[in-house]
Structure formats: structure tokens, C-alpha cells
């Protein structure tokens, strides 16, 4: 969890927002996936949000569903994902690493065992996408026992009770949704969300990162101007992988260029 605190303190000193890319571990295969993650970091990613391949990702649109299918086609398992995470952590000791999970994957070997494994490989946070705040107690309690930040989603229509719960239970960062629905770069986030960000700050929530539909540098700078601590972009990045995975050098070059531009916008 301390890696998030250190990151946000450093960015604050530099008057920058965070740019956080999302990719699915093992897409389009383990070796390429590790190269992709190195490229994202080299190009300026401040933190990573990583998915573990799952057969029924309810919160995700077609782009990220396809990433899951490519990882499955490559035979990637959750155990291999944890091996990848250990390698990433060894190579990049300071970058915050977050997982975006579904409850079934957490339940598989027991909730406590899952968070213990996260701690062991150097994961900083876990967002369980299909567990609402009011059902989150066993997850967040296990997370905190293992020094893992439980991440909560704050939807655009959140009422005051939900805002207070998210602020109270969340650590690391708060995942602020640009809009309702599923992920996807084609559904552009309706920026900005001043009122929610102000309320979250008032209730001492973990810093807000805006996600869902973030696909252009202009959206990153708008999120930061609205008071968010940064932005998360998934589908736009996974699109680049989808279109170019047969030409790895081209894919890595396009990822580098996209992430560099998105990071530059966080300094605006």
C-alpha cells in the first residue's frame, strides 16, 4: 500500500497526475505480455492495473473480453499470472501494481490464501469488480491483513452513503467511474466529475483515479483539471494489442507512443 502513498506524494510535489494503463496478464502470451508491461513502464506509466484472465468478465466490454480469450488461447493460468507478477515486481521494485479481479478467482483457493499470495509476489492493491461495497467485508478484511489495499469503485451516480463507505473502506486509490456500463474506449467518459471528486476529498477517500472510456490525452488532462489524482486507461491500450499482436515490434512501438502521450497529458 505504501507504494501508492509514495507515488501520489511524488506526483503531488511535481504537480502531475498519475497515468495508469490496464492490460490483461498473459495477453497475447506470457513472453509478449511481460514485454508489453516493461514497455508501458518505460513509456511513463506511474502504476499498473492488471487483469487475470477470467471466463465471464461482467464489467468488461468486447475489447477486454477478447484479451481474456487470447490469454486463454495461450494457455495462461492464474498460477502463471502470479509467477508473472513476481517477475514484474522483481524488475520494477517501486511501481504500484493493482489487480482487477472477479470474485470467483478470489474464492477459488480461499479468500485469505488469495491475498496472502498477492502479498508474497508484491501486489499492492486488489479491486474485485463484482463485489459491491456492502458485501466486501471478507475481502477487505483479508486484504488489510496482508497489507493489500482494497480498491472500491465510485460510480457517477453514487449517493452520499456510498461515497462515505468508499472513503471509509478504500485504501490506495479510489476507482472513479466516468460513466455507468461496461469498459470500452468507444464509450467516451463524460468528463469531468468535480462534485464527486470534491466529496471524496471531503470524506478523506484515497486519491481518485478516473477510469472507463479514457482513450485520449485530452481526457487525461481534463480528469486532472477536475481534481482527480490521475486516470486509468484499459480498452484503448488493449485495442493496440488486439490490432498489432501479430507484429510485436509494431505493437510495442504503438504502445510506447500512446502511453508517452497519455502521461504527458497528466502534466498539463
Swiss-Prot record:
UniProt key word Cell wall biogenesis/degradation: no
Keywords of this entry: Amino-acid biosynthesis, Aromatic amino acid biosynthesis, Lyase, Tryptophan biosynthesis
Pathway: Amino-acid biosynthesis; L-tryptophan biosynthesis; L-tryptophan from chorismate: step 5/5
GO-annotated molecular function: tryptophan synthase activity
Cellular component GO terms, alphabetical: cytosol
Active site: 49 (proton acceptor), 60 (proton acceptor)
EC assignment: 4.2.1.20
SUPFAM superfamilies in the cross-refs: Ribulose-phoshate binding barrel (SSF51366)
InterPro entries per the UniProt record, alphabetical: Aldolase_TIM, RibuloseP-bd_barrel, Trp_synthase_alpha_AS, Trp_synthase_suA
PROSITE patterns xrefs: TRP_SYNTHASE_ALPHA
Subunit organization: Tetramer of two alpha and two beta chains.
Protein's job: The alpha subunit is responsible for the aldol cleavage of indoleglycerol phosphate to indole and glyceraldehyde 3-phosphate.
Family to which this protein belongs: Belongs to the TrpA family.
Name under which the protein is recorded: Tryptophan synthase alpha chain
The organism of origin for this protein: Salmonella schwarzengrund (strain CVM19633)
Amino acid at each position: 500500500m505504501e507504494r501508492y502513498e509514495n507515488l501520489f506524494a511524488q506526483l503531488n510535489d511535481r504537480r502531475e497526475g498519475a497515468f495508469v494503463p490496464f492490460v490483461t496478464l498473459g495477453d497475447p502470451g506470457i513472453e509478449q505480455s511481460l514485454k508489453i508491461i516493461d514497455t508501458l513502464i518505460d513509456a511513463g506509466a506511474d502504476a499498473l492495473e492488471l487483469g487475470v484472465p477470467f471466463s465471464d468478465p461482467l464489467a468488461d466490454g468486447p475489447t477486454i473480453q477478447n484479451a481474456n480469450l487470447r490469454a486463454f488461447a495461450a494457455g495462461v493460468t492464474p498460477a502463471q499470472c502470479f509467477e508473472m507478477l513476481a517477475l514484474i515486481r522483481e524488475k520494477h521494485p517501486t511501481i504500484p501494481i493493482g489487480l482487477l479481479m472477479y470474485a470467483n478467482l478470489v474464492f477459488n483457493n480461499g479468500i485469505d490464501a488469495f491475498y496472502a499470495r498477492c502479498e508474497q509476489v508484491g501486489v499492492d492493491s486488489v479491486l474485485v469488480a463484482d463485489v459491491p461495497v456492502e458485501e466486501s467485508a471478507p475481502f477487505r478484511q483479508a486484504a488489510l491483513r496482508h497489507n493489500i489495499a482494497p480498491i472500491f469503485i465510485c460510480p457517477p451516480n453514487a449517493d452520499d452513503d456510498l461515497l462515505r463507505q468508499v472513503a471509509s473502506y478504500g485504501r490506495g486509490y479510489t476507482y472513479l467511474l466516468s460513466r455507468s456500463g461496461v469498459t470500452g474506449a468507444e464509450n467516451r467518459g463524460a468528463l469531468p466529475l468535480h462534485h464527486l471528486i470534491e466529496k471524496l476529498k471531503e470524506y478523506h477517500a484515497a486519491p481518485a483515479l478516473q477510469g472507463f472510456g479514457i482513450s485520449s490525452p485530452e481526457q487525461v488532462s481534463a480528469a486532472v483539471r477536475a481534481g482527480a489524482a490521475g486516470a486509468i486507461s484499459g480498452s484503448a491500450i488493449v485495442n493496440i494489442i488486439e490490432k498489432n499482436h501479430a507484429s510485436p515490434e509494431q505493437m510495442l512501438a504503438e504502445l510506447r507512443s500512446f502511453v508517452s502521450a497519455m502521461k504527458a497529458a497528466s502534466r498539463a
